[in-house]
Amino acid sequence: MATATATSERFELAKHCSSRNWSKAIRVLDSLLAKESSILDICNRAFCYNQLELHKHVIKDCDKALLLEPFAIQAFILKGRALLALGRKQEAVLVLEQGYKSALQQTADVKQLLELEELLKDARREIDGILKSHATESPQETPAYHSEKSDEKSDKLDNHESGASSNGNSHESSSELGEQSKIVSFSKVASKASKQSDGNSDLCNGSVYKEKENGKCGSQINGYYESCKPCNGSDLHDNLAESSDRFGELSINGNKISIKSSKMSHKAEARCGISDESRKNKKYTIARISGTHSISVDFRLSRGIAQVNEGNYTKAISIFDKVLKEEPTYPEALIGRGTAYAFQRELESAIADFTKAIQSNPAASEAWKRRGQARAALGEYVEAVEDLTKALVFEPNSPDVLHERGIVNFKSKDFTAAVKDLSICLKQEKDNKSAYTYLGLAFASLGEYKKAEEAHLKSIQLDSNYLEAWLHLAQFYQELADHCKALECIEQVLQVDNRVWKAYHLRGLVFHGLGEHRKAIQELSIGLSIENTIECLYLRGSCYHAVGEYRDAVKDYDATVDVELDAVEKFVLQCLAFYQKELALYTASKVSSEFLCFDIDGDIDPMFKEYWCKRLHPKNVCEKVYRQPPLRESLKKGKLKKQDLAITKQKANILRFADLIGKRIQYDCPGFLPNKRQHRMAGLAVIEIAQKVSKAWRIEWRNSTKGTTKNGKKNRRRERTNILSQNRGGAGCSSSSFSETSTGYASLEDRSSGRSILSWQDVYSPAVRWRQISEPCDPVVWVNKLSEEFNSGFGSHTPMVLGQAKVVRYFPNYERTLTLAKSIIKDKLSVRSKKDKVIDLSKDEKIEKIMRAETCDELHNIVGEDFWVATWCDSTGSEGKRLEGTRITCIQKPGRLGYDFSIRTPCTPARWSDFDEEMTSAWEALCTAYCGENYGSTELDALETVRDAILRMTYYWYNFMPLARGTAVTGFVVLLGLLLAANMEFTETIPKGLQIDWEAILNVEPGSFVDSVKSWLYPSLKINTSWRDHTEISSAFSTTGAVVAALSTYND
């Protein structure tokens, strides 16, 4: 029976070959090879592929044949012909030479030997001809001509492969602030489509996706988490990759169709989401006889494919419609039409056609793969992976399908699976630059930075003009805070193509992160001259806002709000633009007022601030909060005086000293860019705090010598007089609000009693205000000024792990945090659920299992649900009392692989009260330590108790986390300011890899924190009294406008 079936199939094969119906012949060969692997049938299938000009399929079948029989001369001949057709002449010569040697070493068919010899001569002649023609061209023209022509020819002949083919086309799709991409993964890079406009794509935390519609592509920006910026350390806008808007060519071969992006030397490539090879291992030889109907069908299929390659999708669909009218279940035509639909973004129709093709021929690997790609473009990643996995059943270890599935796994944030798929793909296709790029992105997300860099560099090594790889590598370096390398990569992109707007956007981001906002504005303006994108508009608006050019800032914010979005994830930028426009108008109205009156916490409505912090839709804010007056009124109200903007010699001296001190705040850790604007802000704030505290201590000391210490201490506790803001009824203002408590310098000594009334909040408020004005788009606000949300525990959130992704800035603290969480669980024998219920862990040896857990995943599996544990801080002011520190949380988000492991610090009224009392006690202890016999001392040894008191106060501040954002930098700024007030200057840098705020958070005892920090801090202190010679900051930079000018003016 089996023999009869085989004979029947052989007869059918001969019939299809005679009628030139190569597609059906391939299907018969697939069937035969599924039953028995035959070298002859494999070569026959390669021959059929050759007739359809599916050269990459020819090569793969020949490679299979040569694995089974290293002396299969026919395989060498077919492979050599395929390589020649692809323009890979040097490879062809190597293959043919190897075949010729093999033929000579055995008793070979003389006809085949002569055919090999002739092919080899022809190939060598072609190479010689190319070299001669190149020698006659000018040095400048030769490289360009060779690059473009050879690539174009190669891709045209190579049009049947998927984007995952060995030429490594990139497949994009857009992702940014949300987790899901909203694009079509099908891209077109055929030479005739070169007239279409370039598309764009974005990349965040390393990921890249792309959206294409009617020749237009849109990029998105990534969202960022509260304390932690998207991994690149700069908050948002993390996706950069310029890609060509062209699509690859399409071909059909038996059960498959392929589309492949061509290599573009001037544009970043867009990986065509469709590709294929559906072979199950089968083939046979072919004769040639005519069969008019079959020839007609194949001819129309070829025409349809050609139309797809030309970008004429409507015509292609019309041709396929005619074929399907005659044969409604013809799988090749269904795949072709589905592909055309996919390019038109009619993804549902495309999926329907691919589904019908699968129903008609369940072994049609190409249909499974293309449907997977279409589903991935819709964000249906689970279903997409299922389809691609099914395709691998019919094409085991197919590099094309593995490449495709690796990309989908990457987009679905299954980075581990992505690495596995792409690594296997690259073992077979070592020249797949797209696979290397995505492998680099996946490794970066997993925190394997060395491997990520190597993968990106390998992609560039394969094609030095591959813009996508350069952009991803630039983004990678930016995330690690290696700005020099990032800028070098961007320069490489612009040398290849200076019209890539994403390169200017990324360079703008780097300059923004470095605090060079005016340079960022220049780059973003160039980017906007190329393409009007929401990313560039928003970022340029925020830069204008920071440097005090409020008219331009408002214009860009308005333009951001008016942009027609091509992806829902970008809506968050429009929300932020709304809030920041209001804040720009508020700041504009304050430019001529004293900087003390710049009071976001007191002037801005609590609801406005909450919605801004959470990036919520501003609808409720518009309805319930009084809006800022128009810009004309704000600017009229706050007209700047020229002397405010002038940098006098006196101001220049202060700025030099401020820059020197400010650099000391820099963390030497991955992800933290050296921001010169933030350094200057910190330096000026340090000096102001030192001046303010020094004056208060002098009064305290004078009073203590008069025997009035008791009254002074009492005064620090008493309720303070608030200075009313000058902006009642302004932007998002609450008419009944009051300013954050602040005390002017002059008022310190003007009190009737002559006693100091500085509180701990008076000490920290200047640092908070400077942080707010230095980067006005960061929501730095006091948490207790956030109305009802404060009661439900609004606070900061700092993730170390997000699913499988490791957050570059904070993951270094993961091991210590996990160890601390386990020790707390062992101590308490329980954890808390998301609903704040106690989860008992004292039974079933759970504690023992928890102590053996090495990852947060294992910890979550043992507990069995989302949970949190709270750290604590031993009180210094009230012996035996414990304050609630931060909450170490481990949760699993719906649809996300892995677990989110982070610290969250809620600030409820009860907790605020506890820390307020502790901070008051710590501040009083510091004042007592300095204002007694140590007052004015210039001996470091005599000031040790003062230093310890400063560190204890800093410890409680970090654990308190009273700000929605910015607690870390303001804490260290105040520490430096207090040391300077006591004549001690920190002259070194924070040790490499150390984040001082985490040192406080992960130590439950203040003494442990003090001992840890003093080991490197104290040896770096020197006595400095010359700082007192500088003019008071409140006098030199008295107005808000003068402060903004000081932060925005640099000699370079």
Swiss-Prot record:
The keyword Transmembrane applies. Residues 162-181 have a biased composition (Low complexity). Negative regulator of effector-triggered immunity associated with the EDS1 resistance pathway. May localize its interactors to a microsomal membrane. May therefore negatively regulate RPS4 and SNC1 translocation to the nucleus. Contributes to the regulation of RPS2 and RPS4 protein levels and negatively regulates SNC1 stability. This is Suppressor of RPS4-RLD 1. The chain crosses the membrane at residues 966-986. InterPro entries: SRFR1-like (IPR044650), TPR-like_helical_dom_sf (IPR011990), TPR_rpt (IPR019734). It is found in: Nucleus; Cytoplasm; Cytoplasm, Perinuclear region; Membrane. It comes from Arabidopsis thaliana. GO terms for molecular function: molecular adaptor activity. The keyword Repeat applies. The modification N-acetylalanine is found at A2.
